[in-house]
Amino acid sequence: LRAISGFVSPFSTSASLDLEEAAGAAPAATCRVVADTAERELHLRIRLEVFVREQRLFDTSDRDAHDDDPRTLHVLGLWGRVAVGTVRLYPLDESGQWKGDRLAVLGPFRKHGLGGPLVRFAVRTAGEFGGSEMVAQIQLPNVAFFERLGWRRRGEPADYCDRPHQQMVIGLSDPTGRSPAPG
C-alpha cells in the first residue's frame, strides 16, 4: 500500500495486504478536504472507479469545469487510514447556495457507513463557508438515505446522464447539518 499524507490509497495494494487490516483494528470514518495534488488525484480516481467503471454514468471521465474551479472543495472519506470515498462541493452563486455532488464510496467499503459522514461533512463545510442552502441531484435508490440525513425533495425526478435523479435540498444554518424544523 502507498501512504499519501498519512493515509493509504486503495489503488496501490499488493495482493498479500488486506485493506481492512491496513485500515486499523477499530477503523473510524473521517473526512477531510484534499490537501495537495496527490490527494486530489486520489479523489478523482475514486470517482472514476465508481461513476465511469462501475456505474457507467460517464463514458471516459466524470471531470467537468467544476473540478478546475478554485472554489470547488474536493473531499476524501477515510475508513481508518484507507481513502475510499469522495464528495465534491462548490458555491453556485453569491446568494449562499451550494451544490454537493460526486458522492462516491468504493464498492467493497459501502457496508462501513462512510456515506453519512461524507454528506454531513459536505453540509457542515458549505455552512462554514457561508452557505445557506445546499442542493444535490440524487440517484433515486439513494433518496431515502438523504431524507434520513434531513434533506428534502424539490420538484419531480429528472434524468441526469440518462438516469433518473431527484433534486434534494438542505438548509445550512443549523451546524448539525439538519434542516431547520418547519414553522
Identify the residue ranges that each predicted region occupies.
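Conserved active-site tyrosine of GNAT-family acetyltransferases
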Residues: 47, 146, 151
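Conserved acetyl-CoA-binding loop-helix of GNAT-fold acetyltransferases
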Residues: 105, 111-124
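A conserved beta-turn-beta hairpin within the catalytic core of GNAT-like acetyltransferases
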Residues: 91-101, 110, 160-165
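Conserved GNAT acetyl-CoA-binding A-motif
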Residues: 126-139
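Conserved catalytic-core motifs of GNAT/GCN5-like acyltransferases
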Residues: 137, 152-169
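Short amphipathic alpha-helix that is part of the acyltransferase structural core
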Residues: 10-82, 174-183
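Conserved beta-strand in the GNAT
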Residues: 76, 82-91, 97-104
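Low-acidity, Ser/Thr- and Arg-rich intrinsically disordered low-complexity segments
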Residues: 2-5, 9-12
